[in-house]
From Swiss-Prot:
Family matches, as HAMAP family: MraY (MF_00038)
Listed name of the protein: Phospho-N-acetylmuramoyl-pentapeptide-transferase
UniProt topology in membrane: Multi-pass membrane protein
Cofactor(s), names only, from the UniProt record: Mg(2+)
CDD domains xrefs: GT_MraY
Family the entry assigns: Belongs to the glycosyltransferase 4 family. MraY subfamily.
Species of the source: Sodalis glossinidius (strain morsitans)
Compartment list: Cell inner membrane
Enzyme class: transferase
One GO process term, biological-process aspect: cell wall organization
Biological function: Catalyzes the initial step of the lipid cycle reactions in the biosynthesis of the cell wall peptidoglycan: transfers peptidoglycan precursor phospho-MurNAc-pentapeptide from UDP-MurNAc-pentapeptide onto the lipid carrier undecaprenyl phosphate, yielding undecaprenyl-pyrophosphoryl-MurNAc-pentapeptide, known as lipid I.
Pfam families assigned to the protein according to its UniProt record, in alphabetical order: Glycos_transf_4, MraY_sig1
Catalytic activities: UDP-N-acetyl-alpha-D-muramoyl-L-alanyl-gamma-D-glutamyl-meso-2,6-diaminopimeloyl-D-alanyl-D-alanine + di-trans,octa-cis-undecaprenyl phosphate = di-trans,octa-cis-undecaprenyl diphospho-N-acetyl-alpha-D-muramoyl-L-alanyl-D-glutamyl-meso-2,6-diaminopimeloyl-D-alanyl-D-alanine + UMP
Gene Ontology cellular component terms for the protein in this record: plasma membrane
Length: 360
């Protein structure tokens, strides 16, 4: 919104021209989301404690987690609020891609909020019934997928970018909608599964968002997109502002979520952040790149699928506990060691993903 205001004020003072620069708005978007998150943190934590909205800890989980009982949850509210305000302030409101991401962010946030509310307020350990959770996730994802398809039909915006191959960019047609659906819903639930230790999910989210910010900048620039042999997508550049807002809000949340956590993000945060990352990757035509950069989320999800599948088919478990971060805890790794090592792996995967843009 401030961009529009600056465009009207530039005739009175040329300094307002700085608002037209994407790099400037990306930086202030990060800082705005960061400061908002840091400001809201203590207030939200105190409010959640007053309402006794605390994390539910599984009795069959690692014993070290029992001390987490009573820690406030639903801290994702500060993340979503910070991102939304920052994006509305610094992104061009006429950009349809920005609204697509915000729609998924807020929509999945509402689904996660209802799930958390049922768990911690109504004391329903199952939360939102699984079929209803997937139903609303699907409705939101399909609504955005069809909208994005209508905006970019038969353009590079609906092509598929394949890592390592510069000349393979097939036009997906309606398959675009199906792919977008699975990426958005899948990433949302993958981040949700990863959110099991203090700071474990938020830092890989920050790393991936930072990586996608660089990709968005290149994808929205015709010269760089041509140089890297990736699809040039007309509205993609403005997603840099969205990505940096996620980075800022995530770092602000980490201030309170680092071990030992003062607050957990809850499903309201993890479902929304995962959905937003998936949506951004689809808009940038970098679904395969997200698979690489978000490798930690992928492995966490696969560990659950393999564990459940193995137990149903063979009656045996592959891991001591799934998702896989609990497996390492039960092997005797201290929680901070698991967290930091997963962070390091996540950073490496983001860098490898970015390198694939050039290795073609």
């Amino acid at each position: 919104m401030l961009v529009w205001l600056a465009e009207h004020l530039v005739q009175f003072y040329s300094g307002f021209n700085v608002f037209s620069y994407l790099t400037f708005r990306a930086i202030v978007s990060l800082l705005t989301a960061l400061f908002l998150s840091l400001w809201m943190g203590p207030r939200l934590i105190a409010w959640l404690q007053k309402l006794q909205i605390a994390q539910v800890v599984r009795n069959d989980g690692p014993e070290s987690h029992f001390s987490k009982r009573g820690t406030p949850t639903m801290g994702g509210l500060m993340i979503l609020t910070s991102i939304t305000i920052s994006v509305l302030m610094w992104a061009y409101p006429s950009n349809p891609y920005v609204w697509c991401v915000l729609f998924v962010l807020v929509g999945y946030g509402i689904v996660g909020f209802i799930d958390d509310y049922r768990k911690v307020v109504r004391k329903d350990t199952k939360g939102l019934i699984v079929r209803w959770k997937y139903f609303w996730q699907s409705v939101i994802a399909l609504a955005v997928a069809f909208t994005m398809f209508a905006v970019g039909k038969d353009t590079p915006a609906t092509q598929l970018a394949v890592p390592f191959f510069k000349d393979i960019m097939p036009q997906l047609g309606l398959w675009y909608v199906l792919l977008a659906y699975f990426v958005i819903v899948g990433t949302s639930n993958a981040v949700n599964l990863t959110d099991g230790l203090d700071g474990l999910a938020i830092m890989p989210t920050v790393f991936v968002a930072a990586g996608l910010a660089l990709v968005a900048w290149a994808t929205g620039n015709m010269n760089f997109a041509g140089y890297l042999h990736i699809p040039y997508v007309r509205f993609a550049g403005e997603l840099v502002v969205v990505c940096t807002a996620i980075v800022g809000a995530g770092l602000g949340f980490l201030w309170f979520n680092t071990y030992p956590a003062q607050v957990f993000m809850g499903d309201v945060g993890s479902l929304a952040l995962g959905g937003a990352l998936g949506t951004i990757a689809v808009l940038l035509r970098q679904e395969f790149l997200l698979l690489i950069m978000g490798g930690v989320f992928v492995v966490e999800t696969l560990s659950v699928i393999l564990q459940v599948g193995s137990f149903k088919l063979r009656g045996q478990r592959i891991f001591r506990m799934a998702p896989i971060h609990h497996h390492y805890e039960l092997k005797g790794w201290p929680e901070p060691r698991v967290i930091v090592r997963f962070w390091i792996i996540s950073l490496m995967l983001v860098l490898i993903g970015l390198a694939t843009l050039k290795v073609r």
